[in-house]
């Protein structure tokens, strides 16, 4: 991902304020509610029968935190996203058979959640930088797909 110095600074400054557990759980929960077909990858998560059930599901929250932990690793290695996400790409492709489009959907949901949490601080410039990052992460996660 090519970010200017200003964009990198905007991304890392805001990310330093992100509650990974809260934002991760909300982002994954919203993905599962807004795009219900993504729920099929989470059969072991128990009750996903309603938006409330999804948003309050402890397994959704825990996995959302894990997902954003990996995203944090990506932010620390913006110049090598493909390398950073190579193993996760392989796992999601070969073992989990996740449609790579879901990575793009989750990235866009994450941007919405960040905008919701940070309001005016999430300026159009910050959003543009984050859109570049989530697109880069989605591409890196899709890299191992045949």
From Swiss-Prot:
Q: Which residues carry this modification: N6-acetyllysine?
A: 59, 82, 144
Single GO BP term = hydrogen peroxide catabolic process
Q: Which UniProt keywords apply?
A: Acetylation, Heme, Iron, Metal-binding, Oxygen transport, Phosphoprotein, S-nitrosylation, Transport
Tissue-level expression: Red blood cells.
Q: Where does heme b bind?
A: 63, 92
Modification N-acetylvaline occurs at: 1
Instruction: Report the GO terms under cellular component.
Output: blood microparticle; haptoglobin-hemoglobin complex; hemoglobin complex
S-nitrosocysteine: residues bearing it: 93
What is its biological role? Answer: Involved in oxygen transport from the lung to the various peripheral tissues.
Protein's name in the database: Hemoglobin subunit beta
Organism this protein belongs to: Saguinus mystax (Moustached tamarin)
């Amino acid at each position: 991902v090519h970010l200017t110095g200003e964009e990198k600074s905007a991304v890392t400054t805001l990310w330093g304020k992100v509650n990974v557990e809260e934002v991760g759980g909300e982002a994954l929960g919203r993905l599962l509610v807004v795009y219900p077909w993504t729920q099929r990858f989470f059969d072991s998560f128990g009750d996903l029968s309603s938006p409330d059930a999804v948003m309050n599901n402890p397994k959704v929250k825990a996995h959302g935190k894990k997902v954003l932990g990996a995203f944090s690793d990506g932010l620390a290695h913006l110049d090598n996203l493909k390398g950073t996400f190579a193993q996760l790409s392989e796992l999601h492709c070969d073992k989990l058979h996740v449609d790579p489009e879901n990575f793009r959907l989750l990235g866009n949901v994450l941007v919405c959640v960040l905008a919701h949490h940070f309001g005016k601080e999430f300026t159009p410039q910050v959003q543009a930088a984050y859109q570049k990052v989530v697109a880069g992460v989605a591409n890196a996660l899709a890299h191992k797909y045949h």
